[in-house]
Design a protein with these regions (language model features):
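Active-site clefts of carbohydrate-active enzymes
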Residues: 149-170
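Short glycine-/polar-rich loops that comprise or flank the Walker A/P-loop
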Residues: 187-189
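Short acidic/polar inter-strand loop motif in beta-rich domains
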Residues: 355
Length: 370
């Protein structure tokens, strides 16, 4: 069957020297140069640099070594840790691989991966700040510390933790809708813990070990909620749902996810684009772009409120939430309207660019996208 990617546990407890020297080259040799790997660098602090110790921090593992160490692994581990600890957070490498450039923040550039370790990470600092989407969004100012933050895996809660807590995320349906809209449109790869789409075990202890039955924790068995039948007919489309899975699918958040998945799939810039806030006036407003030989995907996004976007590339912009269309000249502006309510968004795609055939409205199931 094969393997699409590796999720590597407890990365923080293994020296980066060992990853760069042994593990990553071996995995790449087996899986190919583009084989995706991401690791859990569990830091449990709100800041990017874990108590000011660079080699125990999340971004650190996305970089190659920058000094030579002993051929003896046991010695090299100590040398590497001491060298980088003494260098400190302020002397770590930085990158603009995540960022659109140019005078107006509209220009995509080829990422420079010459110093990338080949290991990506769960965005633990963002996870720890995910009390709400706005607070998580505030972490973007630290993205330059990662080799390329667009490869970060982003989640709200997991089998171990919720944001800044040992519980599954306790937020209500509106909070989850906003979180999902943010994760599916901003940089990074969204990851959803099982059951969060129906707020399964919301607020429960994530893990009590032998101190409590699993049923009382966030690791409880979820299978009862997906019993029944359903026929998948296309991506995000299904018929003939019955039993418990029918009730699960009819919840507002799964319907919200149907639309978000379709939207993300239709717009390459949302999947893997660089981003900028330049010329984006809104509480959570940004633009993203991705360019390769076949596509030039440029999109404007505002979440939970209206925004004004200025100094934009010329073209016809179509909002996949409402179907609204606006045509502007080079350097023109777009002002959104009607974007209020938790989880709501306006997502305008420049359909005049190469490979961006968006006919109109995509959203049709979510009660939040309107």
């Amino acid at each position: 069957m094969g393997v699409d990617a590796f999720r590597i546990d407890t990365v923080k407890h293994v020296s980066r020297v060992m990853f760069n020297r042994h593990f990553i080259p071996a995995f790449k040799a087996a899986g190919g140069e583009n084989f995706y790997m991401f690791g859990e660098v569990c830091t449990r602090v709100n800041e990017v640099w874990n108590h000011g110790v660079a080699p125990l921090s999340t971004p650190f593992y996305t970089w190659k070594e920058r000094s030579e160490y002993s051929a003896d692994d046991s010695v090299a581990v100590h040398e590497g840790y001491e060298y980088e600890k003494n260098m400190g957070p302020n002397n770590q490498p930085i990158s603009d691989n995540h960022a659109l450039t140019g005078a107006y923040g509209n220009d995509y550039h080829k990422p420079d991966y010459s110093q990338a370790s080949g290991l990506n990470v769960i965005d633990f600092p963002m996870h720890w700040n995910f009390s709400n989407a706005s607070q998580a969004y505030g972490m973007r100012g630290q993205d330059y510390n990662y080799n390329d933050a667009t490869w970060n895996v982003v989640y709200v809660d997991s089998h171990d933790y919720g944001p800044n807590m040992d519980n599954r995320y306790p937020g209500d349906t509106n909070a989850w809708a906003e979180n999902m809209t943010y994760m599916w449109t901003f940089r990074g790869i969204p990851c959803l813990y099982y059951g969060s789409e129906i707020r399964f075990k919301a607020g429960a202890d994530a893990d009590k070990g032998p101190s409590a039955p699993l049923e009382k924790t966030g690791r409880a068995y979820y299978g009862d909620n997906i019993e029944g039948t359903v026929t998948a007919t296309d991506f995000g489309e299904y018929t003939n749902a019955s039993g418990a899975v029918k009730a699960t699918l009819e919840n507002p958040l799964p319907q919200h996810l149907r639309d978000l998945n379709k939207i993300r799939r239709a717009i390459p810039a949302l999947q893997k684009g660089q981003y900028s806030n330049t010329g984006c006036d809104g509480s959570m407003a940004f633009k993203r772009r991705y360019v390769d030989d076949e596509v030039d995907s440029f999109v404007l996004v505002t979440i939970g409120g209206d925004a004004t976007f200025t100094n934009l590339p010329a073209g016809t912009y179509v909002d996949v939430i409402t179907g609204d269309s606006k045509t502007i000249a080079e350097g023109g502006s777009i002002i959104t309207s009607g974007c209020s309510g938790a989880g709501n968004a306006r997502i305008y795609v420049n359909t005049s660019l190469k490979g961006c055939e968006i006919a109109g409205k995509i959203a049709k199931y979510s009660s939040f996208l309107k």
